[in-house]
């Protein structure tokens, strides 16, 4: 059978949602140039970012942990999807509502952060790039952008039961 080492050889992306330490330094060395590593096992990722960067300085890595850059966590989605759904009385969560959320997160990542957010993350580079792919969980713009976009998507897909409030 095929092993994980076989699967990651020359791979561009590793998506892990499994167990701590399963992606080894030797495996990472075999990946394509500028690999994207999504090591999302919690609380310990499949490979720690400091090890990944030591072995492959060209990699982009995200984990589910708040103590590393690029925290991929549902905390960026769920509260704002629900806020938008509740605000318009959505009868269900649709794919278009989830996509509206994701698109707003992507758009926010490319914009300059507020002074308030920068102060909360003193000393961390919060400019779109390898160490800042998605907004931080404490970015106050998330609720202001995502909830209305989700409510709008609910209205457009016919699941809203009341008008969208002014945000």
Model-inferred region functions:
Residues 39-147, 151-163:
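Adenosine-phosphate binding glycine-rich loop
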């Amino acid at each position: 059978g095929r092993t994980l080492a076989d699967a990651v050889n020359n791979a561009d992306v590793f998506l892990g949602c499994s167990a701590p330490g399963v992606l080894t330094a030797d495996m990472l060395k075999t990946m394509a140039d500028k690999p994207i590593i999504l090591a999302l096992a919690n609380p310990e990722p499949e490979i720690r970012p400091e090890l990944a960067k030591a072995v492959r300085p060209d990699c982009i890595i995200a984990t589910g942990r708040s103590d590393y850059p690029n925290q991929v966590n549902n905390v960026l989605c769920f509260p704002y999807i629900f806020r938008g759904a509740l605000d318009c009385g959505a009868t269900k969560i649709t794919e278009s509502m989830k996509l509206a959320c994701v698109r707003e997160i992507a758009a926010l990542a490319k914009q300059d952060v507020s002074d308030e957010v920068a102060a909360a993350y003193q000393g961390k580079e919060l400019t779109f790039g390898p160490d800042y792919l998605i907004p931080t969980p404490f970015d106050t713009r998330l609720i202001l952008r995502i909830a209305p976009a989700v409510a709008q998507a609910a209205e457009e897909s016919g699941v809203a039961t009341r008008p969208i409030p002014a945000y």
